[in-house]
């Protein structure tokens, strides 16, 4: 098992963890309906980039 030779200082520990934060999901707004959805995914109404691509139960 590996054992560190010297204790890592709080500053170095913070630098090591600096990229471990969570980011929010990239969201997009559908231009035709105004709904918010994940980028590169269809909206709940079945629209993608302003065009109807999937029939939904409401159609």
UniProtKB/Swiss-Prot annotation:
InterPro entries: Ribosomal_bL32, Ribosomal_bL32_bact, Ribosomal_zn-bd. It comes from the Bacteria. Residues 1-59 are annotated as: Disordered. One of its GO terms (cellular component) is large ribosomal subunit. Residues 49-59 have a biased composition (Basic residues). GO terms for biological process: translation. Pfam families: Ribosomal_L32p. GO terms for molecular function: structural constituent of ribosome. SUPFAM superfamilies: Zn-binding ribosomal proteins (SSF57829). Keywords: Ribonucleoprotein, Ribosomal protein. Belongs to the bacterial ribosomal protein bL32 family. This is Large ribosomal subunit protein bL32. It comes from Burkholderia thailandensis (strain ATCC 700388 / DSM 13276 / CCUG 48851 / CIP 106301 / E264).
């Amino acid at each position: 098992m590996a054992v560190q030779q010297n204790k890592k200082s709080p500053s170095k520990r913070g630098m090591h963890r600096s990229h471990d934060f969570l980011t929010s999901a990239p969201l997009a707004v559908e231009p035709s309906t105004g709904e918010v959805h994940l980028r590169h995914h269809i909206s709940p109404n079945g629209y993608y980039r302003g065009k109807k691509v999937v029939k939904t139960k409401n159609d």
